[in-house]
Amino acid sequence: MTTTPDWIMIGGDGPESYNQQSSYQRALLEATKDKMTKAISANLDLDLISNRFIVADFGCASGPNTFVAVQNIIDAVEEKYRRETGQNPADNIEFQVLFNDFSLNDFNTLFQTLPPGRRYFSAGVPGSFFERVLPKESFHIGVMSYAFHFTSKIPKGIMDRDSPLWNKDMQCTGFNPAVKKAYLDQYSIDTKILLDARAEELVPGGLMLLLGSCLRDGVKMSETPKGTVMDFIGESLSDLAKQGVTEQEKVDTFRTSIYFAEQGEIRQIIEENGKFTIEAFEDIIHAKNEFPFDPKTLAISFKAFYGAFISAHFGVEVMRKAFELVEVKAREQISRLHNSKPGMQYLIVLRKN
């Protein structure tokens, strides 16, 4: 499969970087710590814990959230080992963490900010998580945090004006059934390939932990806070085209390879794939709620996540102007955000069959 890493986060450690502007994602990791610990305690076979234990993060970005995720996992494994054997895990287990993301990811910042005093060895694994990136049966627990909503490409026909699948919006809003089906079909194909790859790489009985956002069944993307801000981004780019700051053709050819599936769609895809058993599908109560409805915070947060691939298509200056307009639109239409329907934050625990 050929994949284009359009969604690389803004690297470095500057004020607009993902490293500095991902507190929302980190809050989900903190909210799920106890549930992750219980899930690992209940589902991890102690026989898998030998003198070397491998944890892999797929879609690690540049930190610091990946460090929180893998440390939560290591803490849970050590707690289970200590409780069930009465032994000190530090005497018997060496942990290794594999950090995976596309080769364009800012691995330099990732490794420069590794936590001091960490109790694990670390290695970077560049490559698309839609494909095999590790040897067979080579890791014990994997995690994907806010990376389970990507597709490998834009569905065919979405950007063709002569196609019934023509979508004028930069995202799948959910209001056009044919467009939604095209995105869902592409997401299903990619997710099943991803699950197949992880199933080959996991040891028998190993676990995958998926954390992220999805839609509640029956809710459309543009009805949610996240979808509303995405609409603001698209509207801002269109405004800049009308002002002559960028070309309308560029706006017409810009789409996100992202699909936030409904909860039931995710469950169906995993079950149809058959490589994993769903041990838990938890609805997480996020400490920051769905989003902080502060216009400036919203603009900065979405810039950290989407800014890099908007820059790749339009240039840095257009990207910055677009997010200035996003802040204005969020302020002017704050009631639209307050009246939106909540999305869902989840923790999914999968055991390899």
Curated annotation (Swiss-Prot):
Mg(2+) binds at N167, D252, F254. SUPFAM superfamilies: S-adenosyl-L-methionine-dependent methyltransferases (SSF53335). The keyword Flavoprotein does not apply. Its cofactor is Mg(2+). Binds 1 Mg(2+) ion per subunit. Keywords: Developmental protein, Magnesium, Metal-binding, Methyltransferase, S-adenosyl-L-methionine, Transferase. Pfam families: Methyltransf_7 (PF03492). GO terms for biological process: defense response to bacterium; methylation; miRNA-mediated post-transcriptional gene silencing; regulation of root development; regulation of seed germination; regulation of seedling development; response to bacterium; response to herbivore. The keyword Cytoplasm does not apply. Substrate binds at Y18, Q21, S22, S23, Y24, Q25, Y146, A147, F148, H149, F150, S301, Y306. One of its GO terms (molecular function) is methyltransferase activity. Gene3D superfamilies: Methyltransferase, alpha-helical capping domain, Vaccinia Virus protein VP39. S-adenosyl-L-methionine binds at Y18, G59, C60, N65, F99, N100, D101, F102, S128, F129, F130, S145, Y146, A147. Its EC number is 2.1.1.-. It is an enzyme of class 2 (transferase). InterPro entries: MeTrfase_7 (IPR005299), MeTrfase_capping (IPR042086), SAM-dependent_MTases_sf (IPR029063). Belongs to the methyltransferase superfamily. SABATH family. Methyltransferase that may methylate 1,7-paraxanthine. Prevents seed germination and modulates root architecture during early seedlings development. Plays a minor role in defense responses toward pathogenic bacteria (e.g. P.syringae). Homodimer. This is Paraxanthine methyltransferase 1. The gene is PXMT1.
